[in-house]
Amino acid sequence: MKPEIHPKYTKVTVNCANCGTTFETRSTRNNNIKVDICSKCHPFYTGKQVLVDTAGRVDRFNKRFAKAAPKASAQ
């Protein structure tokens, strides 16, 4: 291996934004790493399914654009 061309491999702290878990690992990044979701809180690993209620958003979208549809067809 050539000297002085490889990145330094240091210890970094990984912080989960969802559950607040922190753990140490090694990486070529110099600073801490923030992740949105980790293995402690991910539904695949925990076995808990989180349902996202999008029905209200879809209904609101359809109502908003149902009013706009007759105006477009009248022209």
From Swiss-Prot:
<keyword id="KW-0689">Ribosomal protein</keyword>
<keyword id="KW-0687">Ribonucleoprotein</keyword>
<comment type="subunit">
    <text>Part of the 50S ribosomal subunit.</text>
</comment>
<dbReference type="InterPro" id="IPR034704">
    <property type="entry name" value="Ribosomal_bL28/bL31-like_sf"/>
</dbReference>
<dbReference type="GO" id="GO:1990904">
    <property type="term" value="C:ribonucleoprotein complex"/>
</dbReference>
<comment type="similarity">
    <text>Belongs to the bacterial ribosomal protein bL31 family. Type A subfamily.</text>
</comment>
<keyword id="KW-0699">rRNA-binding</keyword>
<dbReference type="GO" id="GO:0006412">
    <property type="term" value="P:translation"/>
</dbReference>
<dbReference type="InterPro" id="IPR042105">
    <property type="entry name" value="Ribosomal_bL31_sf"/>
</dbReference>
<dbReference type="InterPro" id="IPR027491">
    <property type="entry name" value="Ribosomal_bL31_A"/>
</dbReference>
<dbReference type="GO" id="GO:0005840">
    <property type="term" value="C:ribosome"/>
</dbReference>
<keyword id="KW-0694">RNA-binding</keyword>
<comment type="function">
    <text>Binds the 23S rRNA.</text>
</comment>
<dbReference type="Pfam" id="PF01197">
    <property type="entry name" value="Ribosomal_L31"/>
</dbReference>
<dbReference type="GO" id="GO:0003735">
    <property type="term" value="F:structural constituent of ribosome"/>
</dbReference>
<dbReference type="GO" id="GO:0019843">
    <property type="term" value="F:rRNA binding"/>
</dbReference>
<dbReference type="InterPro" id="IPR002150">
    <property type="entry name" value="Ribosomal_bL31"/>
</dbReference>
<protein>
    <recommendedName>
        <fullName>Large ribosomal subunit protein bL31</fullName>
    </recommendedName>
</protein>
